[in-house]
């Protein structure tokens, strides 16, 4: 049974086939209607199969109007052509596709240089299916290093723990669950919606495998204070001797800060930062799915975690949770690095930030909303209803915007700000100022009707919207 059941109960039914779908024979089209939940008895003409799938997908949301996702929804046609040329290339077959493997190696070296690694040419890193897998790999390395340091106590009474803000992406909770690590969360407090450096250091002990810093938070787009965190952990080590490494989850900010916040020290310039991940298919500007994980040196990634596989004629080192995966996204990442360079990335990311800050200011000017963030770190901002607004809530706004095609998530913050519900807007490459103007126009048109409501209409907030951050 599939884990995701969808909003409605699925019933077995034949698909409806237009007579013209049957290629040269209109009558055949009506006779070839396939079932939906079992394999058809016979084949269909390719045009018929295509049209059936194409028409069903028309009911999906418009990706360009999806202000919930961080994922890249537009690339140049040339990138699409390159990806199509690589559809049959398996990334694991490095001996058969040596140039694809070389492009992966170059991407790692480019990221190492971008993130100020001590020795970019020899930095250890790999591509992944996304930043979630990259986080899993980084977490495994943190745990294995802790196990090596505590071989005399593990797996006895010692239980490893990982420190992070309550705002972390769900992949970190999965990591702790799958690899039996105790998660220790720093809650939100007041107007602080992410990890506090000193609070994180206070949670550390001899069983702490590391601290995760988010650049930036998916809840509101803010950067966590990586340098302050490292300073607090330096002080902890000086007092107690406990040495705790830091992993920076730069799923989005890892491809924003190097171009727009060059003076911000968050990366391998900080000796305590052991590893960094980013998502190529977010602000790396590549279609899903590709991510990257880098370690500052070979000591940060235990050699025992790297498998060497004699497969199809070559000895290949691999560090991944899967085996076969497409090479097209890695090729697309290299294309984008070549196509844009530093100046191009800076221009694209600055355009997204300009749209975000401008849109946030216009929403604030409507008078019905209060900004939590302004899109001046990640090009992402969160806002809630103003104190005087009682006729509707953020869930009503999200639902009504969806009627106009806009996908804007509404959700409640975690501990200790469960009282706060917000809307979040993600501005990406392809979400232009013109689209932002249309968004404000639609939101403005909705307000008079929302203001006339006697009270918020959302009773089941969990059913009102989905938020997969």
Model-identified regions with their sequence ranges:
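A generic structural motif
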Residues: 217, 339-342, 387-389, 429-433
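Conserved PLP-binding catalytic core of the aspartate aminotransferase-like
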Residues: 369-405, 429, 467-468
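N-terminal entrance/gating region of PLP-dependent enzymes' catalytic architecture
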Residues: 2-6, 10-122, 405-406, 443, ...
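Generic, well-ordered alpha-helical scaffold segments in large soluble proteins
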Residues: 106-114, 141-145, 175-182, 203, ...
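Active-site C-terminal subdomain of aminotransferase-like
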Residues: 251, 259-262, 266-379, 384-388
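Short Gly/Ser/Thr- and Asp/Glu-enriched loop/turn motifs at secondary-structure junctions
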Residues: 120-122, 157, 373-380, 418-420, ...
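Conserved PLP-enzyme active-site core in the AAT-like
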Residues: 129-307, 312
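PLP-dependent enzyme catalytic core of the Aspartate aminotransferase-like
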Residues: 236, 417-469
């Amino acid at each position: 049974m599939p884990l995701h059941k969808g909003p409605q109960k699925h019933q077995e039914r034949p698909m409806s086939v237009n007579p013209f779908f049957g290629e040269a024979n209109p009558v055949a089209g009506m006779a070839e209607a396939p079932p939906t939940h079992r394999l058809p008895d016979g084949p269909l003409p390719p045009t018929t199969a295509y049209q059936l799938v194409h028409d069903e997908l028309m009911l999906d949301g418009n990706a360009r109007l999806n202000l919930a996702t961080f994922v890249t929804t537009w690339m140049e046609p040339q990138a699409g052509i390159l990806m199509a040329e690589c559809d049959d290339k398996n990334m694991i077959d490095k001996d058969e596709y040596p140039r694809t493997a070389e492009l992966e190696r170059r991407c790692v070296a480019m990221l190492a240089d971008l993130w100020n690694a001590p020795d970019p040419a020899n930095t250890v890193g790999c591509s992944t299916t996304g930043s979630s897998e990259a986080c899993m790999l980084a977490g495994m390395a943190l745990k294995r290093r802790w196990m090596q340091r505590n071989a005399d106590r593990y797996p006895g009474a010692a239980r490893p723990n990982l420190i992070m803000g309550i705002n972390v992406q769900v992949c970190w909770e999965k990591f702790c669950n799958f690899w039996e690590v105790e998660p220790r969360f720093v809650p939100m407090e007041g107007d602080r919606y992410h990890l506090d450096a000193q609070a994180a250091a206070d949670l550390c002990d001899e069983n702490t495998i590391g601290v995760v810093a988010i650049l930036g938070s998916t809840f509101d787009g803010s950067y966590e204070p990586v340098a302050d965190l490292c300073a607090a952990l330096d002080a902890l080590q000086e007092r107690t001797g406990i040495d705790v490494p830091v992993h920076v989850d730069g799923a989005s900010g890892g491809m924003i800060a190097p171009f727009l916040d060059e003076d911000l020290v968050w990366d391998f310039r900080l000796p305590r930062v052991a590893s960094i991940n980013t998502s190529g298919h977010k602000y790396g500007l590549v279609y899903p799915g590709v991510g990257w994980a880098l370690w500052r040196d070979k000591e940060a990634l235990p050699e025992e975690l790297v498998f060497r596989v004699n497969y199809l004629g070559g000895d290949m080192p691999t560090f991944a949770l899967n085996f076969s995966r497409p090479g097209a996204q890695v090729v697309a990442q290299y294309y984008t690095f070549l196509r844009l360079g530093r100046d191009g990335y800076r221009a694209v990311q600055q355009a997204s930030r300009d749209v975000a800050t401008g849109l946030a200011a216009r929403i604030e000017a409507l008078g019905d909303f209060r900004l939590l963030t302004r899109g001046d770190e990640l090009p992402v901002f969160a806002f809630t209803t103003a104190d005087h607004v009682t006729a509707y809530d953020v869930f009503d706004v999200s639902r009504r915007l969806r009627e106009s095609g806009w996908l804007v998530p509404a959700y409640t913050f975690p501990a200790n700000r469960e009282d706060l519900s917000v809307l979040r807007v993600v501005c990406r490459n392809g979400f232009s100022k013109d689209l932002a103007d249309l968004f404000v126009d639609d939101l403005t048109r909705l307000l008079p009707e929302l203001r006339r409501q006697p009270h918020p209409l959302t009773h089941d907030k969990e059913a009102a919207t989905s938020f997969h951050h």
